[in-house]
Design a protein with these regions (language model features):
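Non-heme Fe(II) oxygenase catalytic core, chiefly the N-lobe of the double-stranded beta-helix
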Residues: 195, 199-239, 260
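Short amphipathic alpha-helical patches
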Residues: 163, 230, 234, 278-282
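Surface-exposed beta-strand edges and their flanking turn/coil or helix-capping segments
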Residues: 162, 218-225, 282-287, 335-336
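A recognition module on extended beta-rich or small alphabeta surfaces enriched in W/G with H and D/E
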Residues: 273-347
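Extended, compositionally biased low-complexity polar/Lys-Gly-rich tracts
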Residues: 242, 247-259, 276-278, 407, ...
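The feature captures two recurrent sequence modes
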Residues: 1-216, 318-448
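Extended, Lys/Arg-enriched charged tracts that mediate electrostatic binding to polyanionic substrates
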Residues: 136, 223-272
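Intrinsically disordered or highly flexible coil/loop and linker segments, enriched in small
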Residues: 145-149, 216-219, 223, 257-265, ...
């Protein structure tokens, strides 16, 4: 544990009064929860019976695990965790307070107004880590969603099963002091990033629709598995389902997690992955490094652009997609998400640096490349990041697979892609037949 002098210095750097970082005791938290549960002027009032049982659990000091204010139930199995609120240290509460202070400075400038309104509704901007009993009650009353605590990053199948039932998985650990970007989510990401988006009705519906879409993919996968006992066929079915899940996940990533929206002719962020990181919040709007592309998700070609574009999980994004207004997201029904994923499986893909013909540019990023440049880099053995290389191999393997497997690209994009020279395709075919490009060409699901 850091000494008090160090903690005071850290707090001062972030504009936080360390004396205000004082969590309420159990009695104070219970009084807040009791007042909350009594409210009837909300979209989803809590029944008297459920409110009584919920309050009793909190009063006994039972650790919070899965919200119990609706009839929906959820089994997290080995991934279930609990929030033992009184075990958080002063350092952890200070880390929250510093993150919130930093976020508030950037969110007020860069977040869309609908997000800011939602954050104010849930009173997230406090000086201490939220008690999930109270936060869950507030979220449920306003949106019908609830929290479910998890111990680690959970499998994609479970993550989106939660979504389909209007549960959102949240971790219980808090990042270290002054740590900005995380590869795995903490309370700062899950709560200070995602929770406000539940109050944007169309975004909350898109999240649930992704859960339902994945259920459709799982259902079809399981039906096909039941119809065969041949091991190779079963593995092929599993691989195909995972591939479809990845393409659906990309749509989720570029909207719910890292989406930008226009607000009074200015760029604003609504993606939780952006807004949970003060550094990426500024970067996503102001930096000249990433490419920003305007899309209309109600158009099939633009939704395919999302599904066929790779993304980064270890650093700030190289490409962001900008939606004109939230209403355009209403078209992301479960059936349309699945149909788009199936088409994406047959098409060439884009790396996170690619700018394609027909893309509507907000700005061109410093590290952007044309769609064909990755093929020439591969052919000439020029430096390229793993995504550029992986995407080039995948696309060339499709294009070189023979006349019987020729890909029909007509009508899938806003404008035709530049044709890949036959000399490049012929070169790749020879090299691939000799086993030069054996590496994986589909990145694993990031929610695993």
């Amino acid at each position: 544990m850091s000494d008090s002098s160090t903690l005071c210095q850290i707090a001062e750097r972030h504009g936080v009064d360390l004396q205000q970082v004082q969590p309420l005791d159990l009695e104070g938290r219970i009084e807040q929860l009791r007042s909350c549960l009594l409210r009837t002027d909300v979209p989803y009032p809590v029944s008297a019976d459920r409110a009584r049982d919920y309050l009793d659990c909190a009063r006994r000091g039972t650790a919070f695990s899965v919200g119990s204010l609706s009839a929906e139930q959820l089994d997290l199995g080995q991934y279930q965790a609990e929030q033992f609120y009184d075990r958080y240290s002063l350092e952890e509460h200070l880390s929250w307070a510093c993150l919130i202070a930093d976020q508030q400075r950037t969110k007020s400038r860069y977040a869309c107004q609908a997000y800011l309104d939602g954050e104010a509704m849930f009173a997230i901007g406090g000086m201490t880590i939220p008690d999930f009993y109270l936060l869950n009650a507030r979220i449920y009353q306003q949106t019908g969603w609830q929290l479910a605590t998890v111990s680690m990053i959970i499998p994609a199948e479970l993550f989106f099963t939660c979504h389909s039932r209007r549960f959102f998985p949240v971790t219980t650990f808090m990042r270290k002091l002054e740590q900005d970007y995380l590869q795995e989510p903490d309370i700062g990401h899950d709560v200070a990033g995602h929770v406000a988006t539940f109050t944007i009705p169309v975004v909350a519906q898109v999240m649930q629709n992704h859960g339902i879409a994945r259920n459709l993919i799982y259902q079809r996968r399981d039906e096909m598995l039941d119809a065969t006992s041949e091991q190779q066929q079963r593995q092929s079915i599993l691989n195909k389902a995972d591939e479809l899940l990845l393409y659906a996940e990309r749509i989720y990533w570029f909207t719910v997690e890292f989406g930008l929206v226009m607000q009074q002719a200015e760029l604003r962020a609504f993606g939780a992955g952006i807004l949970s990181s003060p550094g990426e919040t500024r970067y996503s709007i102001d930096s000249v490094k990433p490419t920003r592309l305007r899309i209309d998700p109600s158009r099939d070609c633009d939704l395919l652009r999302l599904a066929t574009t790779d993304y980064l999980i270890s650093e700030y994004q190289k490409t962001y997609f900008v939606t004109e207004h939230f209403d355009l997201l209403q078209s992301l029904t479960p059936e349309r998400i699945v149909a788009t994923a199936k088409i994406a499986a047959r098409l060439p893909h884009f790396s996170w640096r690619d700018v394609a013909p027909g893309d509507t540019l907000v700005n061109l990023g410093e590290s952007s490349i044309s769609t064909n440049e990755k093929y020439f880099r591969l052919m000439c053995n020029q430096p390229a990041d793993e995504c550029v290389t992986r995407t080039a191999i995948r696309n060339l393997r499709i294009l070189s697979s023979g006349p019987g497997n020729t890909v029909d690209l007509a009508g899938h994009w806003r404008a035709p892609l530049a044709p890949v020279p036959e000399s490049v395709v012929d070169w790749f075919r020879r090299e691939d037949q000799q086993g030069k490009f054996a590496q994986q060409t589909i990145r694993p699901l990031s929610f695993d």
